[in-house]
């Protein structure tokens, strides 16, 4: 939960600097509404499925945070995670291709 708190701290701090704190707080609250188990599964599945696109999105977000003069520690960590997911997917694809060639 400490990592989740760090995401909220970084996000709300940036939103405050950008003049859209109220909007972002509502967006975060809306994400937490509903079925928490489904949210966790959606985050896991969606991160793996869309890692390439999300890596680019968080890179753009990091640049924006830098432009605001705000820390981007969590955003940088998210970028590393999406890169890791891409590497894992590429390794799995390579293994599947290799296995298919042996069959």
Segments from the language model and where they lie:
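Short, basic/aromatic-enriched C-terminal tail that caps enzymatic domains
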Residues: 91-103
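Helical "substrate-binding/catalytic lid" subdomain
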Residues: 1-92
């Amino acid at each position: 939960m400490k990592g989740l708190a760090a995401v909220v701290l970084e996000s709300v701090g940036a939103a405050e600097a950008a003049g859209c704190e109220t909007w972002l707080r509502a967006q975060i609250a809306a994400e937490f509404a509903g079925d928490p188990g489904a949210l966790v599964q959606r985050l896991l599945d969606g991160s793996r499925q869309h890692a390439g696109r999300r890596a680019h999105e968080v890179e753009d977000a990091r640049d924006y945070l830098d432009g605001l003069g705000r820390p981007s520690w969590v955003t940088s960590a998210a970028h590393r995670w999406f890169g890791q997911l891409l590497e894992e997917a590429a390794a799995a694809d390579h293994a599947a291709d290799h296995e298919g060639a042996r069959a």
